[in-house]
């Protein structure tokens, strides 16, 4: 008889799991943790069937599970109703970063611990942000489509192609990912790097960016915190979103906020899809208010085939830089978050509960971070 059940919900790898053994984040490869879990005397149940609620395999198996592990890239939504139907549930683990798929208030009420592998994919996401910015501002899609379609219209591409140099670029959120985006942007000699966050960056972090810009670009004091979001987006040529999803950020980028942005600005979102109102963003791209929107996160995952972000575009067909949710799940990131999940489970199985402080989202009925809510 097992000590308890661990429910693992991941995306299906299919033939790709056979071709690439490092694809740990798929259901076939199980984060490489099956043997470890079974050695601890626990049962591991795996599934890809997470929807619809309340008739999915997740609903059935969660009822007597002690631990549930899921991922931001294919999230099983641990809703209030699902928590109410799972009396044995004690630990929710996110294989990656971002735990908004868990009803954190309901978890607090039940004193369920929610953890994630903080830092596991911050470099991966920051690199994807940079790639998306460059795809948009350099009109990569326009040139690529001509190349594969047998065309050669240089002017048709160049009329929508710009440099990052001398641009004002901003981030909503300047945490582990947002700061790494700012670090990488310094190399492009921006005019200003702006950030909007509930707390100011440490002076040392700001000085590091300013000094690097002064040394390599001859331009100092480029980093500035902006108190009002509307003021920041009004100045910015490129806006990137790098903050968690919570009640105050849900639907933040709507028609009203977008109206404050520069005409022809670019918006990049690798945080959470629901931070943006899908229809409002699509309309802004279509009208030309936004020159482009890119990212990899969707308000529902997997996104339905008729999601407006799949087909949104501008008159020149170069305004869409969307991908599926891949920014934080490179093979390197998968190795890091698989090991992080194992470390969290080891802390739980040993009854030491000595999780890394930065990995704890809620514990003992209260928030352990201000990223999703105020400490109580």
Curated annotation (Swiss-Prot):
Annotated residues for binding of substrate: 97, 121
Residues at the site labelled Important for catalytic activity: 272, 325
Gene Ontology BP annotations: formate catabolic process
Localization annotation: Cytoplasm
Record-listed E.C. numbers: 1.17.1.9
Keyword Cytoplasm on entry: yes
Signal peptide: none
Alphabetic keyword roster: Cytoplasm, NAD, Oxidoreductase
Predominant place of localization: cytoplasm
Reactions that this protein is recorded to catalyse: formate + NAD(+) = CO2 + NADH
Protein's UniProt keywords contain Phosphoprotein: no
GO molecular function: formate dehydrogenase (NAD+) activity; NAD binding; oxidoreductase activity, acting on the CH-OH group of donors, NAD or NADP as acceptor
Domain of life according to the entry: Eukaryota
Transmembrane segments: none
Cross-referenced CDD domains: FDH (cd05302)
Positions of NAD(+) binding: 176-177, 197, 244-248, 270, 296, 325-328
GO cellular component entries: cytosol
Family under the similarity heading: Belongs to the D-isomer specific 2-hydroxyacid dehydrogenase family. FDH subfamily.
Quaternary state and interactors: Homodimer.
UniProt-listed PANTHER family: FORMATE DEHYDROGENASE 1 (PTHR42938:SF9)
Role noted for this protein: Catalyzes the NAD(+)-dependent oxidation of formate to carbon dioxide. Formate oxidation is the final step in the methanol oxidation pathway in methylotrophic microorganisms. Has a role in the detoxification of exogenous formate in non-methylotrophic organisms.
Protein name (Swiss-Prot/TrEMBL): Formate dehydrogenase 2
Name of the gene encoding the protein in the UniProt record: FDH2
